Amino acid sequence: MSDVLLVLNAGSSSIKFALYEAHTEPTADHLICEGGIGSLGHRPHFKVVNSDGSTRYDTYLPEGTSHDDAMAVLIGWIETTFPEHRLSAVGHRVVHGGALFDGPVDVTPEVIAQLRAFDRLAPLHQPHNVSAIEALAKLHPSLPQIACFDTAFHHRLPEVATAFALPRELTEQGVRRYGFHGLSYEYIAGRLPDVAGQAVADGRVVVAHLGAGASMCAMLRCRSIATTMGFTALDGLMMGSRCGELDPGVVLYLLEEKSMTAREIEDLLYRESGLLGVSGISDDMRTLLASDDPHACEAIELFVYRIARELGSLAAALGGLDALVFTGGIGEHASEIRRRVCEQAAWLGVTLDPDANASLSGAGRISAPDSKVSAWAIPTDEDLMIARHVWRLADGGR
């Protein structure tokens, strides 16, 4: 009986998973299958695809299926479908680790209690990340679970890059910049030498993780030195339904002049803003790019503008720029967004190769051969990054 590792990413209405062979440190070739249970709270859809993309399992679960029920269904399906394998450990994507965790950690009751303290700092993700851990602990109390944090990659940011201009006592209480999407940035940092060469990896690189959630990270020698997200995953770039950077005075105005409650403002900023709020149409970039509605065009223009502005800021933090990397769902697949960003980055030395950008599939260079700053698109794989952390911490890696 061979060991397998399970990677879980639990959200408000879904549980996504990936299953890997665990006889050696996982690579993409060790993926057995992946999928998830979506539309929880409505008509849950359970779909699994094999590593080659073919459908392995596709069904609907009863309406009213809870997150805990869905977890039991998923684990039961894995154990029934793969009797020749032993589930040896589970890795969870956990968005916020605060200042407590600088790397993956074995989950204990004490760790769970510490993670619960961050629920209000990442309301779209953290409560559901931790609930999945708790549900699985009830199902399999002896199964090792490992929490892998989106904040950990930024744990050693320079102090000046983490500080807000607030009274020192608040800073000492943990009100500071943490940064997110760290599992994605960690994966890209590991891929850079192979895709772009060691010289690029050792240089001044800005990585743009563009998806429903979006952020950017300035890397020097593949280490984070500045990032756009802050105390929460609400800060920085405009996102699918999140506002990104916002004058705090707007929040005070909404509280005092519009008599909105804190929860109403949270819903507005996290769930009703960004591409969705500006366009009034959708939080999906594909839908907006296909639309001729002027509000869709305005949303796209603002999205690109914010990226271009933050790129200049991060280049300043690096003292220059050697390479720009796109990743995430939009960064990997939306060549039009890459084109617009690169055109606005021409002053930094980015010269796009239009044909390479339009035809790229997978990882590769999209800038012209004579571009002073090279530009790349590299697919990310947060699940694989988590699987590697789990393997290293669990029995197979010891």
UniProtKB/Swiss-Prot annotation:
It holds the Pfam family Acetate_kinase. Keywords: ATP-binding, Cytoplasm, Kinase, Magnesium, Metal-binding, Nucleotide-binding, Transferase. ATP binds at K16, H209, L210, G211, A212, G213, D284, M285, R286, G329, I330, G331, E332, H333. One of its GO terms (molecular function) is acetate kinase activity. The active site is at D150. Its EC number is 2.7.2.1. Catalyzes the formation of acetyl phosphate from acetate and ATP. Can also catalyze the reverse reaction. This is Acetate kinase. It comes from Rhodopseudomonas palustris (strain ATCC BAA-98 / CGA009). The gene is ackA.
